[in-house]
Amino acid sequence: MRHPLVMGNWKLNGSTNLVNELIAGLRKELSTVDGCGVAIAPPAIYLDQANHQLAGSRIALGAQNVDVNLSGAFTGETSAEMLKDIGAKYIIIGHSERRTYHKESDEFIAKKFGVLKDAGLIPVLCIGETEAENEAGQTEAVCARQLDAVLNTLGAKAFENTVVAYEPVWAIGTGKSATPAQAQAVHKFIRDHIAKQDAAVAEQVIIQYGGSVNAANAAELFTQPDIDGALVGGASLKADAFAVIVKAAADAKRG
């Protein structure tokens, strides 16, 4: 049985004070919550501090990016082994903001996926379509192409112990969200697409929804059979709002 995972992507937000206060708030809010995995991905500069603040809790540490290179003359980059060394477990790759602003290709993201698997880390592979692609009816084709970059190079087995986050780009930070039925349809397509190569692996892949999840829509989203939690942006910067989403996932999947 799949256990849901709710992960907070802090993006380019934070300070030493915020790290301390937000994690203290999360530990308090989530102390009695069971049945849902929880992770946070602060900016890289705060990973060590966050790891210390998370000690003894059930909240896992994540990161927002990784480089394809293992070491060497690559100024400004962070390697998979460095992330592992500092205590990170879940690593976000393929986020639409990196695909857009840093021109990261499907093939480049697949390389990151492989580097993370080799290091024993868990990729959180973000896929999803833009508003124009959505309106053109290309949602499934775009998601398939982004998945195939990994499937065709690393095989379906690479998706063992992996997270996929479906993030309709048109719903990120816009306040828009896919309806639960719309999101479920895409999540089922993603699972079925992986299942074409390996049904057993597809069944255990955690597929998160990542399009403006908030306290108001979380419960209804999580009742869908193929939505296994969420990758949360803005709401992850407030302990109470994030906790509501985690609790909704735990409650929805408990049955």
From Swiss-Prot:
Q: Which residues form the signal peptide?
A: none
**What is one process in the GO biological process aspect for this record?**
glycolytic process
Q: Pathway it acts in?
A: Carbohydrate biosynthesis; gluconeogenesis; Carbohydrate degradation; glycolysis; D-glyceraldehyde 3-phosphate from glycerone phosphate: step 1/1
What EC numbers are recorded for this enzyme? 5.3.1.1
Q: Which InterPro entries match?
A: Aldolase_TIM (IPR013785), TIM_sf (IPR035990), TrioseP_Isoase_bac/euk (IPR022896), Triosephosphate_isomerase (IPR000652), Triosephosphate_isomerase_AS (IPR020861)
The record's subunit annotation is: Homodimer.
- What does the record give as the function of this protein? Involved in the gluconeogenesis. Catalyzes stereospecifically the conversion of dihydroxyacetone phosphate (DHAP) to D-glyceraldehyde-3-phosphate (G3P).
Name the record gives this protein: Triosephosphate isomerase
